[in-house]
């Protein structure tokens, strides 16, 4: 059934003083179905959030990089931006990840984190920042569009 293999929905969970936050159980099941031992986390390129994905993301990233001309600035920038910042994390027996200080600072997380499902990957946001980003996206989607005339 489609959907069970994707990161869907939105969850807000507390971050404890040790930087631990619970990964949504549905998402741990998605990662397990993908035979991902843990989760990859890195600073999102275009958003003030943490990007997350299963290990299968690396193959997708490599395909995207390989499609770019060798030696091109775009290819090099993509490699230099993403590859060094990707880290593998595993959750504990209670389904919690320990976020490192760099990721917490990048996303400006404090006591809570909002997990946002985006299909093949997810992001972890400061709740207030996500509310603004979500509202902007919904406003653009709902904006009247010019319809073709016949």
What are these language model-derived features?
Residues 1-12, 17-20, 27-94, 101-150:
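Flexible "stalk/tail and boundary" regions
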């Amino acid at each position: 059934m489609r959907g069970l293999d994707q990161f869907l929905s939105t969850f807000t969970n507390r971050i404890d003083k040790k930087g631990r936050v619970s990964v949504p159980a549905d998402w741990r099941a998605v990662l397990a179905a993908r035979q991902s031992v843990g989760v990859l986390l890195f600073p999102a390129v275009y958003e003030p959030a943490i990007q997350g994905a299963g290990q299968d993301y690396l193959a997708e990233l490599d395909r995207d990089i390989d499609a770019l001309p060798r030696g091109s600035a775009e290819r090099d920038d993509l490699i230099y931006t993403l590859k060094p910042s990707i880290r593998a994390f595993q959750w504990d027996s209670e389904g919690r990840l320990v976020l490192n200080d760099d990721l917490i600072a990048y996303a400006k997380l404090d006591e809570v984190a909002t997990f946002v499902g985006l299909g093949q990957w997810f992001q972890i946001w400061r709740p207030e920042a996500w509310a603004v980003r979500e509202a902007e996206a919904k406003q653009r989607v709902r904006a009247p569009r010019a319809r073709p005339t016949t």
